[in-house]
Amino acid sequence: MLASQRDLFQMPRDTCYLNSASYSPLPLRTQEAGRAAVGRKATPWTLEPGFANHQHERARAAAARLIHADAADMALIPSISYGVATAAKILTIERGTRVIVLENDHSSPVLEWHTRAGAQGFAVETVNRPDDGDWTSAVLAAIERSGAAPVGLASISSVHWSDGGLIDIEKVGLALRQRGASFLIDATHSAGVLTMDVRRLDPDFVLFPTYKWLLGPYGRAFLYVARRHQGGIPLEQTAFGRRDVRAENEVYFADVSYLPDARRFDMGERDHFISMEMASIGMEMMAEWGASAVAQRLLMLTERIAEGLRGFGVSAPERSVRAPHILSLGFENLGFENLGFEDGMPAGLIEGLATEGIYVAPRLGRMRISPHVFNDEADADRFVAALAKRLRG
């Protein structure tokens, strides 16, 4: 099993950080690269002419490696919302069809379609959170529902951000392909941790940022665009998205036809000297460890926590329907009325744990625990002991 990588991070022993699904800490290597990059921007005359392009292509290749894509199929973007807006501009959603989204999915893969539905004549259908936590069956039932309008698109996360609910994207993708529907995957909480092979899966779009599981900075994200969509018009019109629009040319607009691959969809002002290399380092580290090894380690930690809390009245999704790296705890039936707890998470519980140097997140009335490779068994045991003590009063 992959060992704890704590020594690669600025992680004090008395800090128990279990909130990587919000923000992951930066590895020491990434911090060093960021400091060097600030110095580089301070002395721009030292930059080699090809430096920026090298940074772009290094990041593009690192992102592609995580999902088994070709680098030419990856666009550099600043956020998931930017990527979804790009996909929405490229796609034609037929009138009278449905766009499938998840209840309380993050805003990016949802709101774009609500905004466009009226003008474009399609309906947005929300798949409600299933009582048994089985998102895959619920999504498939919505796609396959007899008598419903055809599905034009499913725009969903592969792992639900709030509780780690896992969607089997291979099963969903197959059902969509059989109906000629498009598939957009927000892989924010799966890229680098869960194996994804776009060659086999054949989605239309896959998006992910670096600031959570990929150990990178905020503001760097990536968009996979299937080749069948690479003739689309980009969200922004840039010189570098065209074949030959260069300041060095005698004729500036020498060839304004678009690049033939996903590079045409790169964001404007992509020369982020400081954060682009930082993003590359985190993605490269994740790829070197391997998604299977990372998932195995994090499953060990979340299972250790779940097992340690048995008998304390908290609920957690069944292992079969949750991602290995996120554990969500519910407090609906604590049975501690004599302690003044009402149904739901006790008030001040998250804040109280933080006073002990233990960091988790409140999400939709539940507690979300999200360890990463810097965590170890001592962190898991410390969290269990602290939470158990507070629940006992």
Question: Could you describe each region identified by the protein language model?
Answer:
Residues 1-393:
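Pyridoxal 5′-phosphate
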